[in-house]
């Protein structure tokens, strides 16, 4: 009787552990931090157009080693979390990657972080300045991401962006 009870308890505990465990991929964060307000690309473009905020788009794959290495650095960065409030944040994994060539300006490597203006246009001039020049949108550290976010914020928000954008339309 006690052997059966012990086996039942062990089985129940294992089941409980299985259903309550998480691999850090719940929600739209997909390991990059569920505390950040992530959107789909479609919803993000609509929100950016309505709010005037630029978009930050992360393109990654679930099986990618470099992507897995970046996730905890990104998710644990308080500075990225704070800066994310100034962007519409989009997280695209696996088959969510757009087929549009604008989303792979210098190749289809992963992970890539791209910045889009509020109209949804990819801004290829915003690159990882401290990264490999052959992979301009590849970021390996939270510090690099923060620098990219600050540059994008400077270029894509406020009067400087509106003046440049308005002149482009004339």
Swiss-Prot record:
Question: Which CDD domains does the UniProt entry name for this protein?
Answer: ERp19
The intrachain disulfides are 64-67
For biological process, the GO terms are: negative regulation of endoplasmic reticulum stress-induced intrinsic apoptotic signaling pathway
Keyword line: Disulfide bond, Endoplasmic reticulum, Glycoprotein, Oxidoreductase, Redox-active center, Signal
Coordinates of motif Prevents secretion from ER in the sequence? 167-170
| Gene Ontology molecular function: any one | protein-disulfide reductase activity
What residues bear carbohydrate chains?
A: 128
Q: Could you tell me the EC number(s) of this protein?
A: 1.8.4.2
Query: What chemistry does it catalyse, as a reaction equation?
Result: [protein]-disulfide + 2 glutathione = [protein]-dithiol + glutathione disulfide
Give the range the annotation lists for the signal sequence.
1-24
**A Pfam family recorded for this sequence:** Thioredoxin_7
Q: Which GO terms describe its cellular component?
A: endoplasmic reticulum; endoplasmic reticulum lumen
Q: Which PANTHER family match?
A: ANTERIOR GRADIENT PROTEIN-RELATED (PTHR15337), THIOREDOXIN DOMAIN-CONTAINING PROTEIN 12 (PTHR15337:SF10)
Q: What does this protein do?
A: Protein-disulfide reductase of the endoplasmic reticulum that promotes disulfide bond formation in client proteins through its thiol-disulfide oxidase activity.
Q: What is this protein called?
A: Thioredoxin domain-containing protein 12
Q: What is the lineage of its organism?
A: Eukaryota, Metazoa, Chordata, Craniata, Vertebrata
GN (gene name) = Txndc12
């Amino acid at each position: 009787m006690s052997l059966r009870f012990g086996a039942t308890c062990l089985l129940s505990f294992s089941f409980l552990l299985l259903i309550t465990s998480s691999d850090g991929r719940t929600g739209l964060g997909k390991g990059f931090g569920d505390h950040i307000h992530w959107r789909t690309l479609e919803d993000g473009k609509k929100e950016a157009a309505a709010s005037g905020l630029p978009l930050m788009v992360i393109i990654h794959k679930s099986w990618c080693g470099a992507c897995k290495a970046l996730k905890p650095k990104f998710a644990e960065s308080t500075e990225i979390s704070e800066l994310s409030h100034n962007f519409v944040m989009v997280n695209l994994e696996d088959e969510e990657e757009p087929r549009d060539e604008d989303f792979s300006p210098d190749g289809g490597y992963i992970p890539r972080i791209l910045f889009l203006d509020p109209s949804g246009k990819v801004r290829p001039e915003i690159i990882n300045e401290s990264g490999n020049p052959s992979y301009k949108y590849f970021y390996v550290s939270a510090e690099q991401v923060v620098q990219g976010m600050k540059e994008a914020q400077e270029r894509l928000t406020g009067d400087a962006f509106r003046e440049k954008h308005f002149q482009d339309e004339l």
